[in-house]
């Protein structure tokens, strides 16, 4: 008997939630379009009198909270160009309001507002050139570090601009806080691009001797790169052949960058692309919150660890 009562209560709550969602959707559509309330109610399969009864009621505390949260949510959503899903929105809403907000509540509000995050595209696979030298996968997917500048990941990714012209972004990511330590955008995917990235990282973190993990791209297997690592007492680690998951957090960053910025725009010049990448990496390091960093941005997490 007790189970039946609980089941009935749960069913009633679900029905109320569905009705509330329908009413909110009608209200939003009626404000944003020229469609009449009568037609919207007919489409939704509800009585117009029921909708007006709901509309003229006194809003509950929960409803007023939802309205405030929706405003906060939409402000964040617009700022990031419609790229955040419910997890990222929840983190930013918690920080902005100082309230404990359940991610399921944010997901429901997103459905009411008819919004969703962008979908990541699959990464193209490329065949690497014959390596001059290789090393073992010393990192072995241990994607954690006790302090900054202990373990770095690096990789190069491709962008297009103008009339099919290509640009290449080389970056180094710190596994401690997932921050981008250094990056270089160039027109050629060559050794100087990768060498300059490492030099910038060493300038940003003088005296550091981290483990540096990469795939087996020809730049990383070159003798010149190996010498640069040895000169700075850096231990080299490489992914196994065809195992991009061995460099997972780096691949994840590329996906985030492209979904939240690159795929949303058309770039006519190298300078336009460069400006947006620079702005996004600054946003990622300083403002974009991560659940695995206790709801902090990479630089906030790094500062607390200092």
Feature names for model-found ranges:
Residues 230-234, 256-306:
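C-terminal domain-tail junction helix/linker
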Residues 128-130, 214-216, 222-225, 236-258, ...:
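RNase H-like two-metal-ion nuclease catalytic core shared by retroviral integrases
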Residues 40-41, 51, 73, 89, ...:
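Mobile genetic element proteins and their domesticated derivatives, centered on retroelements
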Residues 27-54:
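Structured, non-catalytic alpha/beta "coupling" segments that mediate domain-domain communication
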Residues 145-181, 187-188:
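An active-site-proximal beta-strand-loop segment
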Residues 14-20, 41, 49-147, 243, ...:
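Basic, flexible linker segments flanking DNA-binding modules
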Residues 165, 184-205:
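Active-site beta-loop-alpha junctions of metal-dependent nucleic acid enzymes
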Residues 1-36, 63-68, 301:
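Residue-centric detector for conserved, function-critical "anchor" positions
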């Amino acid at each position: 008997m007790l189970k039946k009562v609980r089941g009935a209560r749960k069913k009633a709550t679900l029905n109320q939630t569905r009705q509330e969602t329908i009413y909110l959707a009608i209200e939003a559509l009626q404000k944003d379009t020229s469609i009449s309330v009568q037609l919207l109610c007919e489409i939704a399969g509800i009585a117009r009198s029921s909708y007006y009864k709901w509309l003229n009621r006194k809003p509950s505390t929960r409803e007023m909270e939802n309205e405030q949260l929706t405003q906060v949510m939409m402000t964040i959503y617009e700022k990031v160009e419609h790229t955040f899903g419910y997890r990222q929105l929840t983190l930013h809403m918690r920080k902005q309001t100082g309230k404990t907000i359940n991610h399921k509540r944010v997901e429901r509000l997103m459905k009411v507002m008819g919004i969703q995050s962008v979908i990541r595209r699959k990464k193209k696979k490329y065949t690497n050139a014959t390596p001059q030298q290789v090393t073992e996968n010393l990192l072995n997917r241990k994607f954690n570090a006790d302090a900054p500048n202990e373990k770095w990941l690096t990789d190069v990714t491709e962008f297009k601009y103008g009339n099919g012209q290509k640009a290449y972004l080389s970056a180094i990511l710190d596994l401690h806080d997932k921050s981008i330590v250094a990056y270089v955008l160039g027109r050629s995917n060559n050794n100087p691009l990768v060498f300059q990235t490492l030099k910038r990282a060493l300038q940003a973190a003088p005296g550091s001797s981290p483990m540096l993990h990469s795939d087996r791209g020809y730049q990383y297997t070159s003798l010149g790169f190996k010498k640069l690592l040895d000169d700075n007492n850096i231990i080299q680690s490489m992914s196994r052949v065809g195992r991009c998951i061995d460099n997972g957090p780096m691949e994840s960053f590329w996906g985030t960058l492209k979904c939240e910025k690159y795929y949303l725009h058309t770039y006519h010049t190298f300078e336009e692309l460069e400006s947006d990448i620079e702005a996004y990496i600054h946003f990622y390091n300083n403002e974009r919150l991560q659940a695995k960093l206790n709801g902090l941005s990479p630089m906030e997490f790094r500062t607390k660890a200092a």
